Amino acid sequence: MKNLNIIFAGTPDFAAQHLQALLASNHNVIAVYTQPDKPAGRGKKLQASPVKQLAQQHNLPVYQPKSLRNEEAQSELAALNADVMVVVAYGLILPKAVLEAPRLGCLNVHGSILPRWRGAAPIQRAIWAGDKQTGVTVMQMNEGLDTGDMLHKVYCEITPQETSATLYQKLAQLAPSALIEVLDHLEDGSFQPQVQDDSQSCYADKLTKEEAKLDWTLPAAQLERNIRAFNPAPTAFLTLNLNGNEERIKIYQADVLPHQEKAAGTVLACDKKGVQIATADGVLNITRLQPSGKKPMSVQDFLNGRADWFQAGNVLS
């Protein structure tokens, strides 16, 4: 095994966990690329990404270009003379000049079993679609969107209770070791590049706030998956009209009950077992929710002082 000189590019916590694994490996991280600091919190103070914070703790050189499309940024990267560049949830497009700069090219860790769920939200879309398993793919990067040749796949189960938050953590445990395994054997032929079958591909579009609103014309099973896929963000919600004011209620947990012959959106019951709402197919039984300005709570706690918010027979929009 040859120790490689690596440029690491990433931004969120998921990426930072990969950088941590690289720092604990026999390879050398010679530079770190991450997104520019962004305003965060109530004071809108500039905040460094988790990757930058970790890099600074280890006194690594940090680069934060707004784009890698200009020649100056590309020359700066090429001058690092890296063996390979590892990209994990970086957030910037890598042009051809950057992809070709390292001696062994660029590797990416993607949160799905490619070619399924190329794109921005593979973890969420796997839950949304009702997939029974997912995983991570370590691949060679090309100019397409997650279309490069695959080197290594690691699988994991999606449980019936899985949320995007829990699946994110599962993959964050699996992926770094898969990456290190590929890097350890990158030049000995252990991992042969496998071309993706484009006919089997689908795209994981980013979740939108509009999509987060529960649509009662969908089946209850789909809405229950949406709730888990949209947890923690952008969080599924419904709206109530309370004395002429619109109240937005975030929904964190629900289960599916057999169908009753009522119009979609009709409130069937509201008791300690849950808020039961008719859908296009089946009943959505909401068990954990969050009124505006409050913390997430069980339906039992919600009913204290709010028992009249969901009245049987009312139809939600």
UniProtKB/Swiss-Prot annotation:
One cellular component (GO) term of this entry: cytosol
Keyword 4Fe-4S: no
Enzyme Commission number(s) from the entry: 2.1.2.9
The keyword Transferase appears for this protein: yes
Pfam families membership: Formyl_trans_C, Formyl_trans_N
CDD domains documented for this protein: FMT_core_Met-tRNA-FMT_N, Met_tRNA_FMT_C
InterPro entries: Fmt (IPR005794), Formyl_trans_C (IPR005793), Formyl_trans_C_sf (IPR037022), Formyl_transf_N (IPR002376), Formyl_transf_N_sf (IPR036477), Formyl_transferase-like_C_sf (IPR011034), GART_AS (IPR001555), Met-tRNA-FMT_C (IPR044135)
HAMAP family: Formyl_trans
Protein name: Methionyl-tRNA formyltransferase
Species in which this protein is naturally found: Actinobacillus succinogenes (strain ATCC 55618 / DSM 22257 / CCUG 43843 / 130Z)
High-level lineage: Bacteria, Pseudomonadati, Pseudomonadota, Gammaproteobacteria, Pasteurellales
Gene expressing this chain: fmt
